[in-house]
């Protein structure tokens, strides 16, 4: 949004206040978490990093470990600024989950050799796998299908799942469903690779 006052142009960025607590800015990935669909935007940052990197796993593993190390402290420090224990604005869980999914797919696509589709020059086979992984990850994370939703809220899970899930840590719930979404989305892509190789 912008408006004129005299000869000056003022630009107002909605839903972004960079003067707030530093931990809050980290938790929301510098305001992305406050945008509509913040988790998707955060996941998209990881996807673009993977596509632009020469070796996607290296930067994702490095930043993944850094974020994983600091994320619990960031979560605890910023929690009083949120309205719930699983705030939608907190998007570091989506960053970690998407990074995990991409790393798994990257490793297995190297092992399997990737698809042999006739793709345009501007996109290689591995980039296609990453885009598919991104789409699947967001579907699982948004819909909370099956184990993803059970991890976030065990009360909605079958009895056998509830008996095996004994954690009561709020952060574990926040991060757990994204890790489950990562395993499911990357698992489907790996299954696609396996079927392709089997069909050769």
Listing of model-derived features with the role each one plays in the protein:
Residues 62-75:
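Small-polar-interrupted transmembrane alpha-helices in polytopic inner-membrane proteins
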Residues 191-200:
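Juxtamembrane boundary at the C-terminal end of a transmembrane helix
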Residues 108-115:
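Transmembrane alpha-helix boundary signature
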Residues 38-40, 57-64:
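Short, aromatic-rich membrane-interface segments at the entry and exit
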Residues 1-4:
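Methionine residue identity
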Residues 44-56, 102-105, 159-160, 189:
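Interfacial segments of multi-pass membrane proteins
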Residues 55-60, 118-125:
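Interfacial loop-to-helix junctions that mark the boundaries of transmembrane helices
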